[in-house]
Structure formats: structure tokens, C-alpha cells
């Protein structure tokens, strides 16, 4: 089922680091995965409005960027012509403020993904096989979280990340502590050792 059109949206805020979650999802969909057609935009690039998109992903960063994140989700719905089932949103703010996103009535039907994509792609993305959703039958044991980020999608935008010449890898995820100021345990769960770097 290759050659589906997949759009990735990063809100128009300033940030140092590239959207690693979106980049892992791009790896799942891209040339080394499902072989779909990928497009990455930052902010509201209106050139994508007159195209058909099979799925639209929106990332989020910090909760104080609610306004920019909201604009991007609204824009994704505009692109999808109101078909909320095509829109998926995740990231830090969505994970930490999950209920606030779910409670927003204008976004009913949008899939708000909380935390890491550690389960099978169909389960992590809350896909419904009965509805015949794209890749809903992908119950593979290779979670999206374990994909190598697709750095090539960053070439599609005119934004320079201050740490653009770096590659990010994790030796572990999560944390055993529950510091009041930190969201890591809520986002990633308890401490989990990963591959050796």
C-alpha cells in the first residue's frame, strides 16, 4: 500500500532541536519503511492545501506554545477538509496536557497520542482495522519509537535548527525519580535501558 501522501507539521515556534518524534514516524512511512510520499512543513505553508493527504501528523513541544500548537492542529483540520480521522497529534505538550487536548470540542476525532510509540504501529497510533484505516493491520513488533529518525525531511523547510549538525541517540529513556518540575516520567515512564551507543 505504498505511495500514500503523508504530511508532517511542526508548529511555527522557535526551537533548538528538530522534531525527533515526527522524524521517527517519517522513517516508518518513508523510503526505508512503507515507501510513502512525505512532506514536512513548519508553520502554515498554504501550498499543501490543494493536495490530497492520506494522513497528517502534528507535533507539539512545550505547553506554553499552546497557541502555536492550536493553530497547527486547526490548520491540519483545514488541510484534511474537516476529516479529523486523518489528523494525529503528539509530542511533549500533547502528552503532558492530554486531557486539555481531548476536551477541546473543535478537535473531536483527532487522534491525540500520549507518550512514546512503544507498541506496534497500529496500537501506538490508535488505528481501527474495522474502519479500514491506513496501516491498521500493522501489528509488527518493531515499534515506531525504535526507528532511526529520518533527517532528510528537514531539508524540505527553510528553518535552521541550532543543533542541525548533530545526531541524537538515547542510551536510556524514562526516569526513576519523580521531580516536581520534570515531565520525563510522565512522558517516557520508568527507566529503560536501550541499545549501547
Model features per residue range: what roles?
Residues 171-175:
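Short metal-coordination and nucleic-acid-contact micro-motifs, chiefly zinc-binding Cys/His arrays
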Amino acid at each position: 500500500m505504498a505511495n500514500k501522501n503523508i504530511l508532517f507539521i511542526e508548529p511555527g515556534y522557535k526551537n533548538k532541536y528538530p522534531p525527533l518524534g515526527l522524524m521517527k514516524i517519517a522513517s516508518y512511512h518513508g523510503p526505508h519503511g512503507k515507501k510513502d510520499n512525505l512532506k514536512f512543513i513548519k508553520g502554515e505553508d498554504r501550498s499543501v492545501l490543494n493536495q490530497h493527504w492520506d494522513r497528517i501528523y502534528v507535533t507539539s513541544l512545550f505547553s506554553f506554545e499552546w497557541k502555536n500548537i492550536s493553530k497547527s492542529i486547526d490548520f491540519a483540520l483545514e488541510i484534511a477538509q474537516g476529516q479529523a480521522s486523518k489528523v494525529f497529534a503528539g509530542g511533549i505538550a500533547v502528552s503532558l496536557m492530554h486531557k486539555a487536548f481531548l476536551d477541546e470540542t473543535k478537535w473531536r476525532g483527532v487522534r491525540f497520542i500520549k507518550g512514546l510509540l512503544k507498541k506496534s504501529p497500529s496500537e501506538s497510533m490508535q488505528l481501527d482495522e474495522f474502519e479500514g484505516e491506513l496501516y491498521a493491520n500493522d501489528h509488527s513488533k518493531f515499534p515506531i519509537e525504535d526507528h532511526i529518525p529520518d533527517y532528510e525531511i528537514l531539508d524540505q523547510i527553510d528553518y535552521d535548527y541550532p543543533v542541525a549538525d548533530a545526531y541524537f541517540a538515547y542510551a536510556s529513556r524514562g526516569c526513576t525519580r519523580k521531580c516536581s518540575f520534570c515531565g520525563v516520567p510522565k512522558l517516557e515512564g520508568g527507566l529503560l535501558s536501550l541499545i549501547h551507543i
